[in-house]
A protein has these predicted regions:
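Ordered, small/hydrophobic-rich secondary-structure cores
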Residues: 2-38, 135, 154-155, 161-168, ...
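Sec-exported extracytoplasmic/periplasmic mature domains
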Residues: 21-25, 41, 45, 77, ...
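Amphipathic alpha-helical scaffolding segments comprising HEAT/armadillo-like alpha-solenoid repeats
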Residues: 121-131, 151-163, 183-196, 216-230, ...
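Structural detector for internal amphipathic alpha-helices that build alpha-solenoid repeat scaffolds
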Residues: 18, 22, 108-120, 138-152, ...
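Terminal, non-catalytic domain-edge segments
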Residues: 11-14, 18-128, 410-432
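Polyanion-binding and phosphate-handling cores
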Residues: 5-8, 38-42, 57-62, 67, ...
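Solvent-exposed loop and edge beta-strand segments that line ligand/cofactor-binding
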Residues: 1-13, 23-26, 51-67, 196, ...
């Protein structure tokens, strides 16, 4: 597991021992005995240097050919404690005893990127239920997934775990019900009670479980909308409950599954929905805001009117975190404003085109230009700004591939010509 990673294994290896060492020498020793010692030995070349190992399939490895000797020497320098990265200043993490360190190693076994299931599938039902009560969310999730792969899973033990005094067991029961999806329907009322618990993570996991159960749990939607709209700056300053409820209710799929209200808002209390949407559009996470976008296409133009100022605000004021995914709600908002012929969408679209996250902007820019072009001749007023943006894309944008810069500039200039030739002047509506 250490030898893989979303961006390759370079960072996983670089920060492995400096991270493990925060928990003391017993943790370091256990990790080296399990993995580090043999891995480091095999990684060293005949001349003493350490090249980047790379993934098993090296196609497209952007770190190929790197000399990683310094990263490995950083690990070997841990006992010297000469710099802060190697322990010059004592850390604040609890120092693990030998037994605790070994227990952590055991928790990590039974999984590899090439074979994620076989070890857990060999465990008995009792062993899997025991692992649902683990301190580790990773172990709990793997046990839950293994249970869900079985044809018959008893629900009463999960109901009992949901009422346990041990929070980890309650988390694990929720995780199992998430994996079981509709088969977890008998737990709806117990999960519903968990929505009122004081523990933040328990409320979140209970909400995720209800969303995963799906249609049988639709009766809980009013409570979930109410929870989403709640703001608790003291106990939840980053709005994590709100974040996960955005996914549970509105997400279009992916790791969080399809939200309960993603496809239809029929029968949903409009007052509760509007409150939840307004709150979600202010969440600090761009990905959570993005989930709200499904609402835009499930409401009529008339029903959307009270929400338009909030939708506009979510376009012009980006989320402070989750930047990689923050474009979704902004582009969807611009698309909606154009569909409804909202005048403010013109300026907002141009400003976002210039200020957008460069990541994947070569794909996003044509979308934005298509949105702008739908305003027809009304967009002629922003041609001077578009001209500057095209020049910026072609000549000034930093740290972006030249061929993609030219591609974006060409797209903007083609849009300028199309706007200049446009004779369409749809009637526009002002927000204010």
């Amino acid at each position: 597991e250490r030898d893989t990673g979303h961006t390759g294994n370079f960072f996983n290896i670089l920060w492995s021992l400096p991270g493990v060492a925060q928990s003391g020498p017993n943790a370091t020793g256990a990790w080296m005995q399990e993995f580090g010692a043999w891995y480091f030995d095999l990684a060293r070349r005949w001349d003493g240097s350490f090249p980047h190992q790379g993934p098993p399939e090296v196609d497209g490895d952007s770190y190929e050919g790197w000399d990683c000797t310094g990263g490995y020497l950083l690990a070997y320098a841990m006992p010297l404690k000469k710099i802060y990265l190697t322990g010059k200043h004592p850390g604040v993490a609890p120092q693990l005893a030998v037994a605790a360190a070994q227990a952590l190693i055991l928790d990590g076994r039974g999984w590899s990127n090439k074979d994620r299931n076989i070890a857990y599938d060999k465990l008995s039902e009792d062993q899997l239920f025991e692992r649902l009560g683990s301190w580790s969310p990773v172990v709990r999730e793997r046990a839950a997934m293994a249970l869900a792969r079985r044809k018959e899973v008893p629900i009463p033990p999960l109901l009992k775990m949901l009422e346990s005094a041990a929070l980890d067991s309650r988390y694990g029961a929720c995780q199992a019900l998430i994996a079981l999806r509709g088969r977890g329907a008998p737990a709806i009322e117990t999960l519903r009670k968990s929505l009122a618990e004081r523990d933040l993570w328990l409320r979140i996991k209970a909400a995720e479980a209800l969303a995963s159960i799906g249609i049988p749990a639709m009766q809980t939607v009013p409570e979930l909308l109410t929870l989403l709209a709640q703001v608790d700056k003291e106990n939840d300053p980053r709005g994590m409950q709100q974040r996960y409820l955005c996914f549970a209710l509105f997400d279009s799929g992916g790791e969080h599954g399809v939200g309960m209200l993603n496809r239809s808002l029929d029968g949903v209390n409009r007052e509760l929905l509007d409150q939840a949407v307004r709150a979600g559009l202010k969440n600090q996470d761009g990905r959570a805001r993005g989930a709200i976008g499904s609402v835009y296409w499930n409401l009529s133009a008339e029903d959307l009117k009270p929400l338009l100022p909030d939708i506009y605000q979510a376009i012009v004021e980006p989320a402070p975190s989750g930047e990689m995914f923050a474009d979704s709600i902004r582009v969807e908002g611009l698309r909606l404003l154009a569909k409804l012929r909202i005048e403010e969408g013109i300026g907002a679209c141009v400003k976002y085109t210039r200020d957008q996250n460069p990541w994947d902007s070569q794909e996003r820019t044509p979308e934005l230009m298509k949105i702008l072009l739908s305003y027809g001749a009304h967009a002629k007023s922003v041609i001077p700004e578009l001209t500057k943006i095209a020049d910026y894309f072609e000549k000034e944008e930093k740290n972006f591939p030249k061929e993609l810069m030219i591609m974006k500039a060409k797209c903007v200039r083609e849009t300028i010509r199309a706007i200049e030739a446009s004779t369409e002047s749809p009637e526009l509506i002002r927000l204010k």
